[in-house]
Amino acid sequence: MNDLNLRVAALKVCAHPKRFAELRDALVPLPNTWIAAPHDFVLQFAAAKSSAEQVQVVKDVFYGEQAQDHEDVAHFLADLLLASPLKHAVRNQLTKLFSDNALAKQNASPHRRHSKEHLLEALQQSLGEMANSLAVITPPVSHERTNDVFVSANACLQNFPFGREALGKQVHRFAPLLTTALERYWADICDPTLELSPTRRNELYLYVQNALRFLVSLLAEWSDKLRLFEDQRFPGTSNAVAQKVARYYDTPWDVRSIAALLIGHLARFSGTFKAYVEDCSRPKAEQDVPIQMAALLVLRPVDYTENATLALAILKRIVAVSELKSTVTNLLVFLSKHLFIYSKSLGEMHAHLPDDQKLLYQRILAQLQVFALQNISSDTDSVRHMSSALLHQVLQHAQAAGQEELFQVVYRQFEDRAAYLNASCMALEQLVAVAGVSKSIENCPSLFGVIFPRHLGCEDCVDALFKAMMVSAHKTEPFAEWQSRWFGLLLAAIRVPEKRRQVIEELIAQAVQLEPTRLAQVLLPDDRLPLSCKLAAILGVRQLSARRQNLLRGMKEEVEQALIGLDDHTRLLALRFLVETPRPSELLNADQMGAIELYVRHNANNPSAHLRQLGYGLLQKALKRVHFGLVEYRKSRTPASQEVLQFLIRLIRTLAQNLFPTANYGRRWLSLRLLRDCLELSEMVGITFSELGIELPTEALMACLGDSYEHNKVLAAQLLERFQSHSLFKPDEMIELLLSLRPSDSATGAFQLQVYCKASRVQSEMPTPTHGGTIHEPLTFRALQWCLQHLREGLRLAQLDLGEAAKLNPLYGLLFASRHLLQQLKLKELAKEPQWRQYIDELVTMCLAVSSVVLPVVSSASPEGHLPETCDQETDQPLTNVLDRQLSREELLQVRTTPQMILLCAWRSSKEVCLILGELVQRAPLEEEEDEEQQQQQGDFLLSRAQLEAIGEHFLQLLAETKHRGAFEQAYVGFTMLCRRFWHSESVRLNQLPGQWVDEAMAMVSGQEEWAGKGARLCATRRSAGMPFMLQALVGTELKLGTHATLYRCMNRLLEVCERRTGGAAGITARSHALNIMRALFRSSELAELVTEFMARGIQCALDGLLLAEEWAERNSATLLLAALIVRVFGVERARLETGELHVRNRMTGRIFFTRYPQLFDYFHAALQRESEQMDAGGGGSENASGKRRQAVQLEAMLLMLSRLYPSSLEGAESTLNLSEFVPFLIRICHSHDLMTREMAALVVANFVTQEQALAEIRRIVVELKALQLRLKNTEAANTKLNTNVLHGQLLLLLHLHRLVRWTRPSLTRMQLHTLAELAAPLLQHDACAFSALVAVMVAAMEDAVEPGLLDFQLLEQIGVVYLLNHKEVQSRCQQLGISNRFYQIFGLHLHRLRGISQGIVLHIVEDLAETIWALDELKVELWLYILLQRSLSEQNSLVSEQDIEHFEFSRDIRRYFETLSREQREEVGQELYESPAVRSSVLHMMHMIKSSKNSCWSLQLAGRLAALQTLLRDPGLELNQLVQRCSEEHSTHQEAGLLLGLRRLIGESKMLERKHWLPMLNYAQRLVHPGQPVYLRHQAAELCDSLARNHLRDQLVAGTTDVDIGLVGRFSGLVLLLLHDDAEWVRHRAVQLVCGAGLRTRSGAGQEQEQSAMAPLILPSALIPPFLDTMIGKLTFDDFNMVQRLVDIIAEPFTTADAMELFDKQENNHYCERNHVLTELWDARGRADPRARTPTIPTGYQIFK
């Protein structure tokens, strides 16, 4: 009821929920009868400025003492209450005042107090006047006014006792009005002459529902009073209208249910209830279901004495309808909801039935159970939930009545597998909730015999059932039995690899929560359980937290192993286990601190941002515990606190070591933040660096200032500022960076300058004179003056020659440094000193001058190619990439000036100017905001009025004229800062400026004559360039004020410009600008939901622009706007599903869409109707080709939006805005002349129709196709011309509809195939395109024909005729239209499959596809390769994996064909292909043709597939020598996969690999692991290395080998290091498996030999590298140290070459590898192997800081 009233109230004003919220906060107008009243309380209410003030006035008027007119107060308040919108604050307050509680709170004198009788009289009078207002006006009052009166009066029944009582006295007035209103509503709905729009009809249905609901409420409350009413029209007329409403097919189900309830109440009211129930029990049509359902709902417990048999009969009819219409979702939603309501009323029925009718009660419950069990696993959420609740209610009634039979039904269904597993488990779960566990276990032995062992951890329904039964059993079973049965089953399931471990862990945690102490004793000692399971259980149970210290000691080795293990989930659980504790003040112990250090050491370089954030959060918890330890250390130096201090020291040193120059981003990110936290922690406690015994890692932090990520620069600068007193930076080096052409160098120089200015002592002084007059930040002032000096020099050069300035002094670095230093200062303090004020003045002047110099470049029509006249006009100077390396000044003079260099200088300088000016306006004291006296005395401001005007005009000019996107985007940022300051300014003049700019901008955009000159400056291309950004800044910054007036003003003006359709060039330009600006506003995240109410009009403008636009510019803008609106409505585009369908997050139900944008329903309805009528009329032959195309584009765009909608399960339940309304028009649009339109329309139809509608449409199409086939069979009609567009559209529609219904009606699908087979031959002669669509429909049906018996022999013979057509003719006709004949080959494949003869399938695949006509087709190669890959995958020691199959990207039709084959057919076909000589000869022949032919028809993809296919044959004809030779040759990347498969096969088959092949293959693998190669090839390189290491290189890689090939071992080790540092995680993990599985890691201690096995635990590469290097280096026992050094040099070669330095140090292709860290690990391993080894000399700048 409340939800309905909310919808009604929203409809009274508008349909948009946001506007409805505004309605509730808007002012309540005075009732009409009180507008001219002179009373004081009326005037007080009228003077209120907000809804809050109105509420206060109402309270004051009620509780205050009115000197006069006291009698009128209650009447006024009653009128005001009924006139207020529902849920409005004023109405809510008045409802509270008209109550006994409010009367008790009155403090006025007795004679001026309100009494209950007086208030009831006022309410009664107001209700009477409101009813009279509908009865006396002629002509009749509008439907809207009538509905408002009924809704307001009906609200008196909702939590309003006074209103209910007053309404009861006026019920005789409203009953006839309701009857009359229902007649009027229904007459308008049924009147075809009115031509109601869909939304208007929907409103009328809502009015009908409100009137019916009100009438039902009156009958339920005051039927006795209504019987005294003498007007006989009331029951009869109301019943007649209700009968029509309840049976009308177009009526929403909610309205039909209310009408049916009214029929039942009227039957009881009229004394015909018995006849009414008898009539409902008879067989009825489907449209009578609501009336039958209402008959059950209106039954009272006492009625069952006479009507129990009839009630059972009615229920059986309803359940029968639900079985018959099981695919009609909205019907099932209606029935499930109302049957559940009905079941709740059956509790008292049993007591009123005589003993001889008790059986009827059981049969009623059984019928309800039948419905519940049928729909308990429905795909519709509401049906599923309601059916579950219904079954629960039925079982409760059965338990209370002692009816065990209903429980046995559920048991039998579960045991007999009579329903799907999901349905059986959900039903049993409801039974367990009612009857407990013991009987379920007794009656369902398959629970523990089959279901739980097989499906637990794999099926959600089984998991939910197990959890419910386990929790319930814990309450009744002894612990030993419960543990053995339930917990033991979980422990067994967790060990099965196929189970979902996380689900089982959650169940185990749930079990441990039930018995924390005893289960922990069972769980923790079990070594067979994974550690993640134990940790999840411990962390989930608070009672075990106290024992965590003891648990850690017992699991120390396991936890440490988990911290460096490959499983991310286990690593985080282990870290949580270490750091989380119920008492944050609990100190870390030695084991925990050591484990945390281990985690930081090996997880700092994790490239995953998600895991990095989670790990950092947990480490912060550890630092909080460290803080408590340091506090204790300051108080009393206990051993535990001293240990914490030492841990902090070690942690700081580790973090400092992590900041080496080549550290990857993840390591720097985590280390800088933890280092900051640690240093702040020590500073907070008061522990100095000297006390810590460490020094700040100055060199490392200084190197971090050159980081490519600015937030890392910020952190490093903050640490240096805070903890470094002496700066080592030199001014000449900093200015060199600031003058660099590389923006990253400029940023580095600026941050160095920041640190330099904050230091208390500097090593080199600034080459500028000191200014003794400056008190605030003198060093920063000198630095800024220094930058300003160089800026002046650069500006002078730029004014003379911008090209030379772009090379020698590009300006933007100095501007960035100036802005960066100003950000560190408090500008209010600067305003107090004249020197600072003068500097700001000079800086603003300099910025404006720089902008004027670069403006011609960024405002050029082609900024990317703009080259102004320069002194350098030489054309023979060399081109140099000046951004790759720093050049000297002399070298730069010799570099040719290019447009790109000038553009870089121009737009980045413009960017910095805009940001400087914007930040100054936002933060600096302004002249206009200072007090006048203060200005005269001190003048403490930084920006004057004139400067503000100049800055404002500068931004407006940039945004209006700039063409370069980077420039106007940054101008937008600066202008946003300015607008934000002006909107919030206390200066009236400044506060008004943004509004004036909006008006001017709107005038320019709309093309007003007085602004025509300025409007010409706007950029008509580049999406209006900066103009949308200007409006976005002006609109977005106003939001902080809490008002949206500017947004509404702009949007309405822009929409009016588009809707006005002014002719001429000016109108086209204005609409283009308006569309582009609206696109920016709709995309703005700041405006969020504020623009939602304009989106419907925006969509209409965009679609109209596609149809009516005369120029490409307007059409382009309309297209971009529509794309932005689609993203705003349906969300950011996500990856499509494998079937090609849109992601569910990018779709929406039609109910939600048209509830948000109801006016679009009428728009789409009218547009589709117009298009369909034109289709029927012949397509509008009077239009030209251009007009047709524009019309098709608009229609395609509309269909694109509609294709994202799908029917709701509540379709037709509460609204008539149903998607099915569009289907008749869309079916006719499928006949469009445009191919894309036909395809989209067919897809949308299939999305919108139900299964029943789809079957009906298929029948219609099949009949029409049969008629066409008979017509074409006539020899005279064979030459008649067909409308191929219509035919093709029908076939497309048939295809999509078949995919919806599949083989649900086998007879219809057989008839469809028969008709299409008969039509194929004549259709090929007319149109190959239609023929391809026909065959596609047949293929779709044949694909789904998997079950035996669907197609008989006769039908297969008829279908086979299609494949007997002349193949050459098929190919020829397809080539004429540019159509691939692949569809015909797929058809042949399925035809032979359905014949069921495996030898025939093989014969077709091997021989038919090898015919000359198919020789150049790729299908057979793709099919052969896919079958052989699947065959190899099924073998025990498979040569291939799923990654190989994914790599070749097989098409869906091939994958679908293989899935339709039976298991036996797959095995037989695969074996035949594997052994077939014909396949082998065909493959070798095609490969020879590819090598010898230069024909372009041979694609690289085909060549790659052939190379892979050859390796999978029984006799591939490959020789290892040839493959090894190919490894050293250059060839296409597509062929690498086949080459690798061949190598791995021959290596695996060879018992011994010749030594000469070792190095070539390792070199080949090293080429494959280059970061520029695809991830698949890098993974295959790891597989190749694994094959070599396990089988052929093992003798060289094990310890104790005397004949060691240093080059071989070194190459292999370097290759493994590259794999361990690969950017792709799955490649790194495969390398870890290689090292651990091949026994290439050593661990100290006993059992070392056993560790060299495949059972070695898999750990992170960072933890695996040291033992791996120890194995590879330490096993050499040579006395000659040079041998070890040579091995180390070979291993290090991939990381020390110039190419490696360029590749890894930039971290462009590989973000994980840290070259310097690898070399350090290598040299450390050498030192461990030979202590005599000297420390190597590491290149300058690459040391690791220690």
Curated annotation (Swiss-Prot):
Keywords assigned by UniProt, alphabetized: Coiled coil, Endoplasmic reticulum, Phosphoprotein, tRNA processing
Gene Ontology biological-process entries: adaptive thermogenesis; negative regulation of endoplasmic reticulum calcium ion concentration; negative regulation of lipid storage; tRNA methylation; tRNA nucleoside ribose methylation
Gene Ontology terms for molecular function: calcium channel inhibitor activity
Gene disruption phenotype: Flies are hypersensitive to the cold, hyperphagic and display elevated triglyceride stores resulting in an increased resistance to starvation. Heat production is impaired and flies are slow to recover after cold treatment. The size of the lipid droplets in larval fat bodies are significantly increased and flies display increased feeding. Total body glycogen is also significantly increased in adult females but not in males. Mutants also display an increase in calcium-dependent SERCA activity. No effect on levels of circulating sugars, glucose and trehalose.
GO cellular component, one term: cytoplasmic side of endoplasmic reticulum membrane
Expression sites by tissue: Detected in the larval fat body, salivary glands and wing imaginal disks (at protein level).
Subunit architecture: Interacts with SERCA.
Protein name in UniProt: tRNA (32-2'-O)-methyltransferase regulator THADA
Species for this entry: Drosophila melanogaster
